[in-house]
Amino acid sequence: MSKKFVHTQEELEKLSLKELENLAASMREKIIQVVSKNGGHLSSNLGAVELSIAMHLVFDAKKDPFIFDVSHQSYTHKLLSGKEEIFDTLRQINGLSGYTKPSEGDYFVAGHSSTSISLAVGACKAIALKGEKRIPVALIGDGALSAGMAYEALNELGDSKFPCVILLNDNEMSISKPIGAISKYLSQAMATQFYQSFKKRIAKMLDILPDSATYMAKRFEESFKLITPGLLFEELGLEYIGPIDGHNLGEIISALKQAKAMQKPCVIHAQTIKGKGYVLAEGKHAKWHGVGAFDIDSGESVKKSDTKKSATEIFSKNLLDLASKYENIVGVTAAMPSGTGLDKLIEKYPNRFWDVAIAEQHAVTSMAAMAKEGFKPFIAIYSTFLQRAYDQVIHDCAIMNLNVVFAMDRAGIVGEDGETHQGVFDLSFLAPLPNFTLLAPRDEQMMQNIMEYAYLHQGPIAFRYPRGSFILDKEFNPCEIKLGKAQWLVKNSSEIAFLGYGQGVAKAWQVLRALQEMNNNANLIDLIFAKPLDEELLCELAKKSKIWFIFSENVKIGGIESLINNFLQKYDLHVKVVSFEYEDKFIEHGKTSEVEKNLEKDVNSLLTKVLKFYH
């Protein structure tokens, strides 16, 4: 095995500072090379190279829990953990994950943000109960500190006094810069033994000072908060080192060694540059955060241009049109303005549309209050991230029966981001909620109609749409959206019917066209609504058909199959139901087409299964 990147802690310790810097440069080159071919999270990984090397040098990755928040910035860690020979398979089907996974030797799975410090706290408790001497190390970006869970964990960690290191990667995504050289000097001074001892003595003196002197001392302490962010963490009971240069290996290693020696919870504040080492990406957060394949020299995408608009682009344009038409429309996204297309609305209507950072719970509840005040909120959110606000969806929207619209992007299989990001559960967790209405467009025109309907609808409503483009274009005429009404797209005398939902309609149509070429046929229904179902149409369909095939990009449990079976039981109807929804297991990463083929959900596999029912 090549030893270019794979180093044990002992081997790293033997390298000179210059050799470590050369290692960092080689790793950046490798990361750029692989991401340019496979796509991935580029800028965040380029900004965390030195931090990861220093972690592996000062701490023992085989013993100390290494916890990466979100873990999209863990590529260097992978290269240092024996993954060099398979690094070229990054994000590919059956290849290396773009996130941390225990099955690949990592401590914990990650993909959603702001979990690392809670994991570190739990690891600290377990280590203490076992009587062991390990130290958890959590690497978290400053953007992830915009989520409340991170502060909940910091609050307990500061009170616990467990040995733990929180490495804060500040790439200017949310934390403001400290002020000048004085701040840097004071922050670094805080880590010295003299400062720690001096601070404790001052605290004891304050206990015996008269009130007036104590008041002046407190005012003096408050003034320090204007100079450095360190006291925020200190007030939570955490030691603080920083800010340091997150690309200066000497500084990082020194800070980590100091933190390790403290044997207390400590935050190291490291300032980094996203995209470091690739000039085209440096400082350009949004464009180079997550990328597809690109040409290294020009930075241009090498993906063949798709003339079809993405579902996200269609959503964004439609919402712009609606917002210009209806002044009571407002909207929010949680740290995904460009990903959801809400950036265009934030730019045009800054007083009506907001990015609230990684704060899905707050996003939902704040919009619930706006709905209570007579506004019509559109919450633009990825299907997978709506899971993070489930209690708020129930407690603050459904129970109140408020007029809130949930626009769920990235529904279905999302491809290379894998199991933590697949949008295959939203139907299952929203369908049981009273007052909720659920629907999905099959194409661009139906998306427009559904969004207009969603604005007029009374009560909470959610519609889902895929990553990328709709498969269908103008194969079928659009229909007016009426509550709980489906559309019978292909009607004939066949005893077999295809029931499609959202992008599933396209799959059903592709299978049906292949059947028709074999002189077979089937009815095709676009359910449009998952809740409420079109019971009138389905009762009519049940009289003339014997087998219903379900095409929907959700898991089977709690999905369309479950809803259809409940309907059949309600009316004592006897129809065989065959669902092509996803099985009860998490879906791995890879190109969507390859993942579908692995799951036997591609058109050819579905056709083979359907043909078994034709005699």
From Swiss-Prot:
Entry EC number(s): 2.2.1.7
Residues binding Mg(2+): D142, N171
The protein, known as: 1-deoxy-D-xylulose-5-phosphate synthase
Domain of life per record: Bacteria
The species this protein was found in: Campylobacter jejuni (strain RM1221)
Keywords for this protein: Isoprene biosynthesis, Magnesium, Metal-binding, Thiamine biosynthesis, Thiamine pyrophosphate, Transferase
The protein's assembly and partners: Homodimer.
PROSITE patterns for the chain: TRANSKETOLASE_1, TRANSKETOLASE_2
GO cellular component: cytosol
GO molecular function: 1-deoxy-D-xylulose-5-phosphate synthase activity; magnesium ion binding; thiamine pyrophosphate binding
Keyword Transferase: yes
Catalytic reactions on record: D-glyceraldehyde 3-phosphate + pyruvate + H(+) = 1-deoxy-D-xylulose 5-phosphate + CO2
Gene that this sequence comes from: dxs
Binding site for thiamine diphosphate: H72, G111, H112, S113, G143, A144, N171, Y278, E360
Gene Ontology terms: biological process: 1-deoxy-D-xylulose 5-phosphate biosynthetic process; isopentenyl diphosphate biosynthetic process, methylerythritol 4-phosphate pathway; terpenoid biosynthetic process; thiamine biosynthetic process
Cofactor(s), names only, from the UniProt record: Mg(2+); thiamine diphosphate
Pathway(s) per entry: Metabolic intermediate biosynthesis; 1-deoxy-D-xylulose 5-phosphate biosynthesis; 1-deoxy-D-xylulose 5-phosphate from D-glyceraldehyde 3-phosphate and pyruvate: step 1/1
